[in-house]
């Protein structure tokens, strides 16, 4: 804005700095001294000094003084008590009138600038009111529409999150119950497997006994066969002996027929044969009895072993059926567990997806809230900047008011008359020519501070002749 640039330049020209508030990190103090001296040779010298000091926009003060001094700076000049050089007085009066004219022009310019500043302040106040109205409107809109929408959506999201949390807890409880059932069934399966192993070990021992009984039976059968062969051999041997004895008996009969006087051998042979037959029958009966007893014992042991084997087979079949039923039940429970785990994973994935969507929505809403906060902060900063500019303008207006009051008080003072001046006559021959040039000395002092410490200080002197 052109008005702001003009005000900033005028503020810089009057106070030695910018028209806005100073930065918090670096403070600058400007000291500007303007001295105007009118040299009138060595007799009369009116001097006008102007000093304007500014350390900060909040502490500006202005000192403006104008005086007429009479000096005598030339040694050895003869002074008279009763004569006045009116040419010098006319020159002084002319210079004084010119100074007053210039001051009137400056006051007129200051009045114009003051009016411009007042207009600018009014304009900035209007802009400030407009911005405040917009800020209040934005606050009302955000509170009425966006706030209610965000709160309603947040409540809905929280309700859904709570529902999903409850569903997840319920599924976790069901999963824990199924896990306990599976663990119990696994323990039961382990017990059944141990019992099956014990039954198989018992069956293996019974099979070993059966094998041993079969081997014993085979051995006994071989013994029976060998005994039968031995009996057959003994029978055959006995028959041969009987035949031999009969042959001998026949021969003895012949001999008896021939010789009647010999002893009777038939009775002896009959006795011997009866004895052998009785011994053979006895041995055969004993062998048969022993074989029968052994065969009965072995048959009884085989029957017992067969009963135990049959019972073991029945138990094994029963255990096998139980294992198969438990295996089927475990497989069914595994399928149920897998389906539940799959459903739980799907629910967790859906929950994670919905949570991510809700999180994105929350993040987007938070970003919008942050953007609105930043926009409000920007409006507040603009308002603060405008307030700082207004304060600076108020300070400048107060300064101008003090200047105007000082000028009014100075103008209201009566002008000194030449009759009241204590003038001394000087030797006009020794007076130099009147110096009509005005000397203006400008002192610019810049002080930079940071965190309360002076980091740089510069001074500049400018001498201008008018």
From Swiss-Prot:
Keyword presence, Cell membrane: yes
Chain spans, region Linker 1: 132-153
InterPro entries assigned to the protein according to its UniProt record, in alphabetical order: IF_conserved, IF_rod_dom, Intermed_filament_DNA-bd, Intermediate_filament
Tissue: Detected in eye lens fiber cells (at protein level). Expressed in retinal lens epithelial cells (at protein level). Expressed in Langerhans cells in the epidermis (at protein level).
Phenotypic consequence of gene deletion: Morphological change from tubular conformation to circular conformation of beaded filament structures in retinal lens epithelium, potentially due to loss of contacts with surrounding intermediate filaments. BFSP2 and VIM double knockout mice show a complete loss of cytoplasmic cytoskeleton in retinal lens fiber cells.
Site location (Stutter): 351
Source domain of life: Eukaryota
Sequence segments annotated as region (Coil 1B): 154-245
Annotated region described as Coil 1A, given as residue ranges: 96-131
Keywords: Acetylation, Cell membrane, Coiled coil, Cytoplasm, Cytoskeleton, Glycoprotein, Intermediate filament, Isopeptide bond, Membrane, Nucleus, Phosphoprotein, S-nitrosylation, Ubl conjugation
Pfam family name, one: Filament
Cellular localisation: Cytoplasm; Cytoplasm, Cytoskeleton; Nucleus matrix; Cell membrane
Spans annotated as Tail: 408-466
Family: Belongs to the intermediate filament family.
Name of the protein in question: Vimentin
Name of encoding gene: Vim
């Amino acid at each position: 804005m052109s008005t702001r640039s003009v005000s900033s330049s005028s503020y810089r020209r009057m106070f030695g700095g910018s028209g806005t508030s100073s930065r918090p990190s670096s403070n600058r103090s400007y000291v500007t001294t303007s001295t105007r001296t009118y040299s009138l040779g060595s007799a009369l010298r009116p001097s006008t000094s102007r000093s304007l000091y500014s350390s900060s926009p909040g502490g500006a003060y202005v000192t403006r003084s104008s005086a007429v001094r009479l000096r005598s700076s030339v040694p050895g000049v003869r002074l008279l008590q009763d004569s006045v050089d009116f040419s010098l007085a006319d020159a002084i009066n002319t210079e004084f009138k010119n100074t007053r004219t210039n001051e009137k022009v400056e006051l007129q310019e200051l009045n114009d600038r003051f009016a411009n500043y007042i207009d600018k302040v009014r304009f900035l106040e209007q802009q400030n009111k407009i911005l405040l109205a917009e800020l209040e409107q934005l606050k009302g809109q955000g509170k009425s529409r966006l706030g209610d929408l965000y709160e309603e959506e947040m409540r809905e999201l929280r309700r859904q999150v709570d529902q999903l949390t409850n569903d997840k807890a319920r599924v976790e409880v069901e999963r824990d119950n199924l896990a306990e059932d599976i663990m119990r069934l696994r323990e039961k399966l382990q017990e059944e497997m141990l019992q099956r192993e014990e039954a198989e070990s018992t069956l293996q021992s019974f099979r070993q006994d059966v094998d041993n009984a079969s081997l014993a039976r085979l051995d006994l059968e071989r013994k029976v066969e060998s005994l039968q062969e031995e009996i057959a051999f003994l029978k055959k041997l006995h028959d041969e002996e009987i035949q031999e004895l009969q042959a001998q008996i026949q021969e003895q009969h012949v001999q008896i027929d021939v010789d009647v006087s010999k002893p009777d051998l038939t009775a002896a042979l009959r006795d011997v044969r009866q004895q052998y037959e009785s011994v053979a029958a006895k041995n055969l009966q004993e062998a048969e009895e022993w074989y029968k007893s052994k065969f009965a014992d072995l048959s009884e042991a085989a029957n017992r072993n067969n009963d135990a084997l049959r019972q073991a087979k029945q138990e094994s079949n029963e255990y096998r059926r139980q294992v198969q039923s438990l295996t089927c039940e475990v497989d069914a429970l595994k399928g149920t567990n897998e389906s539940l785990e799959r459903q739980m994973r799907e629910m967790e994935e859906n929950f994670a997806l919905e949570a991510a969507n809700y999180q994105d929505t929350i993040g987007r809403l938070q970003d919008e809230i942050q953007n609105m906060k930043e926009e409000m902060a920007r409006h507040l900063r603009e308002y603060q900047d405008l307030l700082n500019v207004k304060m600076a303008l108020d300070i400048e207006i107060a300064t101008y008011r003090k200047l105007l009051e000082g000028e009014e008080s100075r103008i209201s003072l009566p002008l000194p008359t030449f009759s009241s001046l204590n003038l001394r006559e000087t030797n006009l021959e020794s007076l130099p020519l009147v110096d009509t040039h005005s000397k203006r000395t400008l002192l610019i002092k810049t002080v930079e501070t940071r965190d309360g410490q002076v980091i740089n200080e510069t001074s500049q002197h400018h001498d201008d002749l008018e």
